[in-house]
From Swiss-Prot:
Belongs to the anaerobic G-3-P dehydrogenase subunit B family. Conversion of glycerol 3-phosphate to dihydroxyacetone. Uses fumarate or nitrate as electron acceptor. It catalyses: a quinone + sn-glycerol 3-phosphate = dihydroxyacetone phosphate + a quinol. GO terms for molecular function: glycerol-3-phosphate dehydrogenase (quinone) activity. Pathway: Polyol metabolism; glycerol degradation via glycerol kinase pathway; glycerone phosphate from sn-glycerol 3-phosphate (anaerobic route): step 1/1. GO terms for biological process: glycerol catabolic process. Composed of a catalytic GlpA/B dimer and of membrane bound GlpC. It comes from Photobacterium profundum (strain SS9). This is Anaerobic glycerol-3-phosphate dehydrogenase subunit B.
Length: 442
């Protein structure tokens, strides 16, 4: 099978690249081994929360010069400020077309999102159903917050969250209460409520009659509150509409927070991106895995997958965006770090004792998270120190940055995927123009 572009990996980086290529009319396919890390994600887009030295970032764009000084090999620095801004603007508009509205603070500063543990994480863009707490004066005008869960739901414990939230100095004058609301018609269900995950609850509450009953129970359980916080259990495609309806039924201001996996806020992004890609004519090879490829004369000629075996997949350009260790895009051996498909050149620390901090929850970053594939400024990979002209890298596979410590995972994934797509489009256009010119001469 022959394509203009083949994308290895179905996460944010891979799908961003694939969608942009498909928008340009390129024949594009995505090879996805399974569920992406979006199923474990908050559904917010982190741009840059901390600099490599640990300094918190208020305004990501304003921190670019300092980032360049501290980490010149950082993926953002390879792309440049303008390209990163262009990529994130494109992503906001693209995902908006699928009904998901991502926004930042009015001054485009970072904001805080509430976690299931009752702590805060800095991020840049959040979905319309997520309450944005400002970095300064975090509690704002809130006097009463109600943390509400579904009775028996294991993936959000509001009392634990309330205890942690009440310990924060900014919330010392804020009343924080908890409540549990029983699912409608619970006695008729055949399952124990402790077995229900967020997706199961979302299916129950799609029934409008049950949603009305749930709203009445919420009013009784909560009473009054300035902000009602619920776990994200309201559908992956229609969650925002359900929340809006629930606000109308209860009179509450309601926000969602991501649950323990599976995270519906993350799944919403994934399904929106996949449906958009398919609408553009893209192909997704689900449940398949690239096992090897043939590299000749500095080019990747073909790849072979588990399902297609001896039938190669061929493209003019390839992107590998298989993620880091969590997604098996990188493999850690006893004394080495490897990229397992093409054996690409990687950044590694020879002394294993230097891979990590002595404590897991350390104040400094774990060095192994900056290990990854070496790329040039065009994000082209290399093997045995030879650049592979038509093989690009994007996302968590890249070296020289720590998506967890720096809070920039989604931003790097989107911007590098977009940057690679723009180069693929440019090469594709040049090839078409050359072919047209040759036909004209002939």
């Amino acid at each position: 099978m022959k394509f203009d572009s083949l994308i290895i990996g179905g996460g944010v980086a891979g799908l961003s690249c694939a969608i942009r290529c498909a928008e340009a009319g390129m024949k594009t396919a995505v090879i996805a081994a399974g569920q992406s890390a979006l199923h474990f994600s908050s559904g917010s887009i982190d741009f840059l929360s901390r600099l490599p030295n640990g300094q918190p970032v208020y305004h990501p764009m304003a921190a670019f010069n300092e980032l360049q000084q501290q980490s010149p090999e950082h993926p953002y620095c390879k792309l440049g400020k303008r390209k990163v801004q262009e990529a994130l603007d494109w992503y906001q508009e693209m995902i908006k077309a699928r009904g998901i509205y991502l926004s930042s603070q009015e001054d485009e500063a970072n904001h805080l999102r509430l976690t299931p543990m009752g702590t805060f994480r800095s991020t840049w863009l959040s979905q319309q159903t997520v309450h944005q707490f400002p970095l300064t004066n975090t509690a704002g005008e809130l006097n009463h917050i109600a943390l509400v869960t579904v009775d028996g739901f294991r993936d959000f414990q509001p009392k634990l969250a309330a205890d942690n939230l009440s310990k924060l100095a900014q919330f010392k004058d804020v009343k924080i209460t908890t409540a549990a609301v029983e699912l409608p018609d619970f006695e008729e269900m055949q399952r124990n409520p402790c077995e229900f995950r967020s997706i199961d609850i979302s299916r129950v509450l799609r029934d409008e009659r049950k949603l009305h009953a749930f709203a009445k129970s919420m009013i009784q359980a909560v009473g009054k509150a300035d902000l009602v916080v619920l776990p994200a259990v309201f559908g992956n495609g229609d969650g925002a509409a359900t929340i809006k309806l629930l606000e109308g039924l209860t009179g509450f201001t309601i926000c969602e927070l991501p649950t323990m996996p599976p995270s519906l806020l993350g799944i919403r992004l994934e399904e929106a991106m996949k449906s958009h890609f398919k609408m553009l004519g893209g192909i997704i090879l689900v449940g398949d895995e690239v096992q090897r490829g043939d590299i000749e004369d500095g080019e990747l000629k073909r790849i072979f997958t588990r399902n297609h075996r001896d039938m190669p997949l061929i493209a003019d350009n390839y992107l590998i965006a298989t993620g880091s260790f969590f997604s098996r895009g990188m493999a850690a051996q006893r004394l080495s770090i490897d990229e397992p498909i093409f054996n690409l050149d990687t950044v590694a620390i020879p002394d294993r004792d230097q891979w990590y901090q002595p404590e897991f929850f350390a104040s400094k970053a774990h060095p192994f998270l900056k290990m990854g594939v070496i790329c040039n400024d065009q994000l082209q990979a290399s093997a045995n120190n030879q650049t592979i002209d038509n093989l690009f890298c994007a996302g968590a596979l890249l070296a020289h940055y720590d998506p967890v410590f720096e809070g920039c995972g989604s931003g790097v994934a989107i911007s590098t995927g977009f940057h690679v797509a723009e180069q693929m489009i440019s090469k594709h256009t040049a090839r078409q123009n050359q072919n047209n010119k040759e036909r004209t001469i002939a």
